[in-house]
């Protein structure tokens, strides 16, 4: 039973809360709360025997500050996170408390998961993982060349050989914005 903590109106809900899980045949627990409290979420995990959980790192930071020992989280089998950088101490604390490794991912409203720590991988805290095989990912430096190991750059998706499944078509009624982000066979994520 999968729980993603994301407002259903948010882009994350499309692939991380509804469609991705439906395609995989998973059971989905949809819970939209007006105000987040760690005790509320931990209670839902316990009472409904949630097995798979995906909130952003900020939620994990709040969960580990709560007295988790008051809750039976033994149903949890798999936990992922996305939306911001995961702090190493949050990763380690959550793992120590639950025994579960947090698997990170990166995607945008414009894309599905583009980088991730996939189930067959050992997570490396601080790393978003590896490119999703459905995307031709590159890291471009400010001068437009592919970054070398250790260099910083912008995550881009090459589309010169075709548009991958999951990549948006265009920004609604904003052709200039679309052209700024996606031109010459490359989609620039801005990240």
Where are these regions (language model features)?
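Conserved AMP-binding/adenylation subdomain of ANL enzymes
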Residues: 1-51, 66
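Gly/Ser/Thr-rich phosphate-binding loop
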Residues: 18-19, 23-26, 50-55, 64-124, ...
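Beta->alpha turn/N-cap motifs
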Residues: 56-57, 161
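Active-site glycine/GP-rich loop and adjacent strand/helix microenvironment
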Residues: 117, 129, 148-151, 169-170
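Conserved beta-loop-beta connector loops within the AMP-binding
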Residues: 138-158
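Conserved ATP-binding/catalytic segment of the ANL
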Residues: 156-191
């Amino acid at each position: 039973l999968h729980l993603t903590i994301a407002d259903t109106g948010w882009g994350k809900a499309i692939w991380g809360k509804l469609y991705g899980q439906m395609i995989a045949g998973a059971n989905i627990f949809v819970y939209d709360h007006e105000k987040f409290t760690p005790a509320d979420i931990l209670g839902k995990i316990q009472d409904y025997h949630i097995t798979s959980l995906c909130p952003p790192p900020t939620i994990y930071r709040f969960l580990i500050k709560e007295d988790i020992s008051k809750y039976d989280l033994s149903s949890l089998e798999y936990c992922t996170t996305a939306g911001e950088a995961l702090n190493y101490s949050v990763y380690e604390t959550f793992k120590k408390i639950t025994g579960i490794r947090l698997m990170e991912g990166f995607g945008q409203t414009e894309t599905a998961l583009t980088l991730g720590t996939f189930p067959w991988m050992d997570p490396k805290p601080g790393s978003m993982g590896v490119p999703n095989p459905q995307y031709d990912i590159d890291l471009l430096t400010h001068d437009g060349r592919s970054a070398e190991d250790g260099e910083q750059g912008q995550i881009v998706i090459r589309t010169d050989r075709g548009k991958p499944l999951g990549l948006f078509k265009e920004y609604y009624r904003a052709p200039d914005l679309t052209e700024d982000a996606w031109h010459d066979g490359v989609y620039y994520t801005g990240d």
